[in-house]
Amino acid sequence: MSAALTETPAWQALQAHFETLHSVHLRDLFAADPGRGERLTAEGAGLYLDYSKHRVTDETLDLLVALAHARGLPERRDAMFGGEKINVTEGRAVLHTALRAPRGSDVLVDGRNVVPDVHEVLERMAAFAQQVRSGSWLGHTGKPIRAIVNIGIGGSDLGPVMAYEALRHYAQRELTVRFVSNVDGTDLVEKTRDLTAEETLFIVSSKTFTTQETMANAQSARAWLLSALGDEAAVARHFVAVSTNAEAVQKFGIDTANMFEFWDWVGGRYSMDSAIGLSLMLAIGPDGFRELLSGFHDMDEHFRTAPLEANLPVLMGLLGVWYNNFFGAETLAVLPYDQYLAYFPAYLQQLDMESNGKHVTLDGQEVTYQTGPVVWGQPGTNGQHAFYQLIHQGTKLIPCDFIAFAQTLNPLPLPGGAPHHDLLMANVFAQTEALAFGKTLEEVLAEGVDAALAPHRVFDGNRPTSTLLVDRLTPRTLGALIALYEHKVFVQGVIWDVNSFDQWGVELGKVLARRIVKELGADEPELSHDSSTNALIRRYRERR
């Protein structure tokens, strides 16, 4: 960028506007504009966004869109979709969007159309999934597969496990699907404790087939299998790989015909719609997986073509910048009111925090402003009985994303009362209303509350929320929802001028761990860390 972000006219215009708006209450904004709740909405790819309960005016939105133009967002978006190497620190294109491009599309990387490669892998995945799901893929002893265990970590785990839990309603119930990620042996032991080796298939997901945690778990899973079946040949019937390292895969004992590849233009946290999603395809079937991809593509097209002022990822991204950089908000709460989305906040933690948790700009200069927020959350209504107290009456401003579905997948009547889903949705609407408008001291006193107690019953309100209301949770709408957040993160990375597609921050600890693990196994060599680390290692040696 030619000028530091905070020195640009667009930023300074927003700063001046903030000084006049930051003390204005949402009560006043709604009172001045009776149609605000219907006007400040947007729709795309089957998702409906109500952003009227944000501390913004039309002028705010115009200034935010002007900032996006000033930072070159449309051009950067087109560069990403066009296959330019926008991951500058690794010299790579960023083309997770190609993973869901329809057959016949053209997406070029170094002059070569990669879409045929994507669909060739998808067809191989589908053929394999059909074999397993139909029972025609037999294990070493001739029994069909009844359990799938995905072994991966980071993007090779968080996306698949989130999507599997989200789409469990559509899964083949005869198949047990589990996910092992933590190098803590407890994870593998507990996930395999009640499984039968003869009927278990492991998917080892590691692009390089060298990821420390994944390969430790894979080797232990291999030993578990062989302890039951004895024959090395069994590995080829009970393990498949998602990788590009054919030599290492073959050495492990996996038939390379059962190795499903993906590409260096796919980042780990953006890879769940590649072969990394094989476990999900096994669960929901090839048709369901293709519907998921269609939902991703729906949002890709919306992001690529919709005007910025009506573009869901752009609006959500810019609103996040507004609170992060002007109001000083440090976190974002993601609150899905659907139990199937229990893992969605954890998935977004990696997507957002690994992407935009950066302290230097694209050209290596230290930033002078805040970048990515801390992302967290829990399904409703559980969170209401845990941390909503702080959101309502605490001293920290916490913008919230509420996600809800008009139709439940599990209608459950309540004898003598409203259906469960009506109870759930009533809480969605009540929470966003309470957060926006609160309750004044005068209103509390008018209810006859004792004057000494009344201050404790006051809700300041003016807490900003977005509400995403979707008709129904399906593979297609889930794909659109995930892509919405992918592109929102991209928008913010462009505004902050950071590389949203590398993750150097995870490297230093990994390097040190490789050194330390050798030191844990013996009293020598002499430790040469800081005094704290040395003391902790010695104590561990003594007490293990």
Swiss-Prot record:
GO molecular function, one term: monosaccharide binding
UniProt entry keywords in alphabetical sequence: Cytoplasm, Gluconeogenesis, Glycolysis, Isomerase
Database matches in CDD domains: SIS_PGI_1, SIS_PGI_2
Family matches, as PANTHER family: GLUCOSE-6-PHOSPHATE ISOMERASE
Protein family membership: Belongs to the GPI family.
Alphabetized Pfam families for the sequence: PGI
Functional description taken from the UniProt entry: Catalyzes the reversible isomerization of glucose-6-phosphate to fructose-6-phosphate.
GO biological process: gluconeogenesis; glucose 6-phosphate metabolic process; glycolytic process
Name used for this protein in its record: Glucose-6-phosphate isomerase
Cellular component annotations (GO), alphabetically ordered: cytosol
Lineage, broadest ranks: Bacteria, Thermotogati, Deinococcota, Deinococci, Deinococcales
